[in-house]
Regions:
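Non-cytosolic coordination micro-motifs
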Residues: 11
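Charge-biased low-complexity segments
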Residues: 2-6, 17-141
Length: 141
């Protein structure tokens, strides 16, 4: 869990591992997945949290949008499932999540989550995408 500026709490939780399209028979329940898969998912979660918390223009704009619109009709949902595919070198190939009502916020989050390298390669034969639960919780100061 990461507290940002004392008002916004962002957390990612591993939801499930799922296979690439066309490989449904390879699905693994998270409890049955190899430990290296769970460790890698935690690393991805940590990196996503770091990137969202970064003190830079896009991340600041996204966090401000969440703070301003949370709990409102046009605001972010309380929980968002982010599907992430990673390349063999640890870079984020793509992410997929339901769009927000604000196209700019949607693009900002997509930019943030695709911006870098998580620092490790996915474990051999790890099923993708990773499905990560993204919770936005506000705490009033």
């Amino acid at each position: 869990m990461l507290i940002l500026r004392g008002t916004l709490v962002l957390s990612f939780g591993l939801l499930v591992f799922s296979p690439a399209p066309g490989h449904a028979e390879d699905f693994r329940n998270p409890e049955q997945a190899p430990p290296s898969w769970a460790q890698f998912a935690k690393l991805v979660k940590y990196r996503f949290e770091e990137w969202i918390a970064a003190d830079e223009t896009v991340a600041n704009r996204f966090r401000n949008w969440v703070i301003e619109h949370s709990g409102k009709e046009n605001g972010p949902p309380p929980t968002l499932v982010v599907r992430a595919w990673l390349n063999p070198d640890g870079t984020v190939e793509r992410v997929n999540f339901p769009a927000f009502n604000d196209a700019g916020a949607t693009e900002d989050l997509r930019t943030i989550l695709k911006r870098g390298n998580v620092g490790e390669a996915p474990p051999p034969e790890m099923l993708q995408p990773l499905n990560l639960r993204f919770s936005l919780n506000l705490r009033k100061p």
